[in-house]
Amino acid sequence: MAELEIFDNGVSIEQIIPALDRDGAVIIRDLLSMEITTQIIEDLSETLEASTPGSKSGIESWEEFHGGKTVRFCGLAAKSRAFVDHALLNEYLIKVSDHYLLKSCADYWLNTGQVMAVGSSEPAQYLHRDEDN
């Protein structure tokens, strides 16, 4: 597996694209400020506390992969204005999406904004595409 390249916030999109092409992902340090991160966590904490850990699929292989102590939930845009303003509408996300998607379409939208709160002692997941998308 490739070691992901780490960039500082403020780097140009032109510097990021070659690493994305090569590795499929990058890390951008301090993409969201601590203040914004805290706000998103506060916005989502009630849903996190109310969510049951583990897979709801009933399929043993998915249950093992998802982890019995990990909580997942979607619909972040409806639960956190800070998520919309600072993550969903983040300049890097938009520029990267435009770079790759607008070559073959007139418009696009994000299908899922999801929290995955990995429980203690859960095994790490490898970098992967969901459902091979």
Explain the meaning of each model-derived region.
Residues 1-22, 29-132:
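Non-heme Fe(II)-dependent double-stranded beta-helix
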